[in-house]
């Protein structure tokens, strides 16, 4: 069975973790690209804040290339087969790295800035902004990496302005179809 990668993209707080939960419920492995930056931030600064996360993101891409986080993620998935989910792709450069490695699709999750800000304040994850100004700075950083281009070119889109259940159902149904398609494609080969 070949590797098939579902690349999940979305602005912070859009609901990418709902896609990850649906994937896990379907038995799919999930890899979070943000974990690479969180680990590197912790190593470099000993503390994870919005500022240290932004600086680490810029620094590793400047020192090691725009594709650094994707390459580090591929190191984690290189022995995998079947459908896997990679959460947090941020640029078309990263998408190209994955496309060279395996068949891919992009699943984008979208929510308005106001909705995302409220979610981020509630989840209280290390490195998350706790005020509107930092939230906007983080959004601008994400957009500078090219995240908007990835979302614009997505193969599938979930608009997540409603309930968690609605977003989960949408994600689950899309992922289930992709798993079924992958199984059929592999049985045909």
From Swiss-Prot:
GO molecular-function terms, A-Z: ATP binding
Residues given in the record as ATP binding sites: 10-17
Pfam families xref list: AAA_17
Source organism, top-level taxon: Archaea
Keywords: ATP-binding, Nucleotide-binding
InterPro entries tied to this protein: NTP_hydrolase-rel (IPR022970), P-loop_NTPase (IPR027417)
Entry keyword annotation includes Cytoplasm: no
Signal sequence extent: none
HAMAP family named among the record's database cross-references: UPF0200
Homology family: Belongs to the UPF0200 family.
UniProt-recorded name of the protein: UPF0200 protein Smar_1234
Natural source organism: Staphylothermus marinus (strain ATCC 43588 / DSM 3639 / JCM 9404 / F1)
Organism taxonomic ancestry: Archaea, Thermoproteota, Thermoprotei, Desulfurococcales, Desulfurococcaceae
């Amino acid at each position: 069975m070949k590797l098939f990668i579902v690349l999940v993209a979305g602005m912070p707080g859009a609901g990418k973790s709902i896609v990850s939960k649906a994937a896990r419920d379907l038995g799919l492995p999930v890899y979070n690209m943000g974990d690479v930056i969180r680990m590197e931030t912790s190593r470099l600064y000993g503390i994870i804040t919005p500022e240290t996360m932004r600086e680490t993101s810029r620094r590793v891409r400047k020192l090691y290339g725009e594709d650094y986080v994707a390459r580090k993620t591929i190191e984690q998935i290189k022995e995998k087969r079947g459908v896997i989910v990679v959460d947090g792709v941020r640029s078309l450069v990263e998408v190209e790295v994955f496309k060279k490695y395996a068949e891919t699709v992009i699943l984008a999750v979208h929510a308005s800035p106001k909705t995302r800000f409220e979610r981020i304040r509630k989840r209280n994850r290390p490195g998350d902004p706790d005020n509107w100004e930092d939230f906007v700075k983080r959004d601008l950083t994400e957009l500078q990496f090219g995240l908007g281009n990835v979302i614009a070119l997505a193969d599938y889109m979930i608009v997540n302005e409603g309930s968690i259940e609605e977003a989960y159902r949408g994600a689950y149904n899309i992922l289930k179809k992709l798993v079924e398609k992958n199984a059929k494609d592999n049985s045909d080969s």
